Amino acid sequence: MATTHLDVCAVVPAAGFGRRMQTECPKQYLSIGNQTILEHSVHALLAHPRVTRVVIAISPGDSRFAKLPLANHPQITVVDGGDERADSVLAGLKAAGDAQWVLVHDAARPCLHQDDLARLLALSETSRTGGILAAPVRDTMKRAEPGKNAIAHTVDRNGLWHALTPQFFPRELLHDCLTRALNEGATITDEASALEYCGFHPQLVEGRADNIKVTRPEDLALAEFYLTRTIHQENT
């Protein structure tokens, strides 16, 4: 059985640009209220007492991060990220010190709820593999014909989940799985897929569907609505 109540290091890959946002500014530096999306995402992690450090992987040419209050935060370490998400996560893991467990969270996912985070972190008490926040698929899913915008067939949504973040794993296990998957040319779309590639089966922890990732222009207003609602609920 896993050890309980260990301090956790979080890794936030923030070296991407996000061209689908159609802005010159990387999406993690767009503002919601008086903070950037990145700040909202990081503060949600640090709000939990078990998260004692956050490692943020930024682009080597990033000049925006140094202007944020996060740059001088005592619990934050900054490292150079890589060309791909997995490279940035590996750079973050190397800076995570001797942390036994690590969270990986999207820089552009600012609406994380504390109850979801707490339930995910509880996996360290029962699991040796870890798991991810995820939401059951609710919509009818269609598969397109190859190379066409035409329906091939309807996909059975039973058992389908939307993968969210944070994702939570033993540090050494995640490091080894990411390294092997990259060395063998596997397609890695999130951290859990690296563990899957190596034969592990992380847990699915149901999280709120409003834990959205800001990817397209219309997501910004939706994230602002969710954050404003959460702040209002916490203050009433």
From Swiss-Prot:
The record marks R157, K213 as: Positions MEP for the nucleophilic attack. It comes from the Bacteria. InterPro entries: IspD (IPR001228), IspD/TarI (IPR034683), IspD/TarI_cytidylyltransf_bact (IPR050088), ISPD_synthase_CS (IPR018294), Nucleotide-diphossugar_trans (IPR029044). Pathway: Isoprenoid biosynthesis; isopentenyl diphosphate biosynthesis via DXP pathway; isopentenyl diphosphate from 1-deoxy-D-xylulose 5-phosphate: step 2/6. One of its GO terms (biological process) is isopentenyl diphosphate biosynthetic process, methylerythritol 4-phosphate pathway. Keywords: Isoprene biosynthesis, Nucleotidyltransferase, Transferase. It catalyses: 2-C-methyl-D-erythritol 4-phosphate + CTP + H(+) = 4-CDP-2-C-methyl-D-erythritol + diphosphate. GO terms for molecular function: 2-C-methyl-D-erythritol 4-phosphate cytidylyltransferase activity. The record marks R20, K27 as: Transition state stabilizer. It is an enzyme of class 2 (transferase). Pfam families: IspD (PF01128). Its EC number is 2.7.7.60. PROSITE patterns: ISPD (PS01295). HAMAP family: IspD. Catalyzes the formation of 4-diphosphocytidyl-2-C-methyl-D-erythritol from CTP and 2-C-methyl-D-erythritol 4-phosphate (MEP). Homodimer. Belongs to the IspD/TarI cytidylyltransferase family. IspD subfamily. This is 2-C-methyl-D-erythritol 4-phosphate cytidylyltransferase. The gene is ispD.
